[in-house]
């Protein structure tokens, strides 16, 4: 599939990506290579391959649940843009 500069510009606009004019030819080349790989994958015969959710059929070992009390309020509040009395302040969304 060939990607001309207009297609790249339009795709970048739809994806809300700021793409400088100087980068458009390189991005077009990258998109063509990606689509080439997609075409190679489409050409692979998979009718005899069973459908699977994951290629490895392994169980996930889980640790037992343990109740642990950790007071991390100060650590969590430090990353909040606005907090008051130990609570997050959020913008009012309903008038």
UniProtKB/Swiss-Prot annotation:
SUPFAM superfamilies: Glu-tRNAGln amidotransferase C subunit. Belongs to the GatC family. The keyword Protein biosynthesis applies. HAMAP family: GatC (MF_00122). Heterotrimer of A, B and C subunits. It catalyses: L-glutamyl-tRNA(Gln) + L-glutamine + ATP + H2O = L-glutaminyl-tRNA(Gln) + L-glutamate + ADP + phosphate + H(+); L-aspartyl-tRNA(Asn) + L-glutamine + ATP + H2O = L-asparaginyl-tRNA(Asn) + L-glutamate + ADP + phosphate + 2 H(+). InterPro entries: Asp/Glu-ADT_sf_sub_c (IPR036113), GatC (IPR003837). This is Aspartyl/glutamyl-tRNA(Asn/Gln) amidotransferase subunit C. Its EC number is 6.3.5.-. Allows the formation of correctly charged Asn-tRNA(Asn) or Gln-tRNA(Gln) through the transamidation of misacylated Asp-tRNA(Asn) or Glu-tRNA(Gln) in organisms which lack either or both of asparaginyl-tRNA or glutaminyl-tRNA synthetases. The reaction takes place in the presence of glutamine and ATP through an activated phospho-Asp-tRNA(Asn) or phospho-Glu-tRNA(Gln). GO terms for molecular function: asparaginyl-tRNA synthase (glutamine-hydrolyzing) activity; ATP binding; glutaminyl-tRNA synthase (glutamine-hydrolyzing) activity.
